[in-house]
Amino acid sequence: ECALAVGGGFEVRSRQAEGQEELEEPEAHCSGQAAAAEAVAWRAVEAGSAQRRCATAADAGALYSASAAAGLAYGPAFRTVEAAWAGDGEAAARLRRRAALQGTQVHPADLDGALQASSLLARGGGEGGGATRLPFAVNAARLRGRAAGALLAEVEGRGAEAAELRLAAGAWGERGAQLEGFRSRVLASDAAVPPQKQHLYVTA
């Protein structure tokens, strides 16, 4: 459920379905502030440009195998990365064509594909391969038009932890989504929760 507050604040949370187990307090998953976006320049994604800058081809199957080893198992519907390339602090991915947006401007699975591509960025420090990284925060998210058809994701590093993500559709990449100041955090081994008897979701 999404709870709205006066002033534009929101919180996305879930609760156990009645009849499964004893009802508990809602569990918050994210919170934020919604506001009208200021006029900013939209950075279009040029088809082929990111691949030319990212010279190292990455295997999509290996990407999902590494994700599973790190504790992030993606079902077939969320394995949207078809091809990927990595470069110096930059990555690009071609996502599977989606026939229907199901009432959205940008399908959540497609946006998640752009987040998956961010794992290709070379990270400094001692939190490298094998660590489970989870999305933590986004400074700003912007949508522009309906992103249907073939999609290209670009990820550009912004320091050790932050990145800018662009998900675009169309020949000139003028439709899609931008995430500014995206940050992920390493999940500490002692913070992982035990397996649940009743999941709040089903892996698609």
Summary of predicted features, one role per range:
Residues 1-204:
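Acyl-thioester-processing domains in fatty-acid/polyketide/NRPS systems
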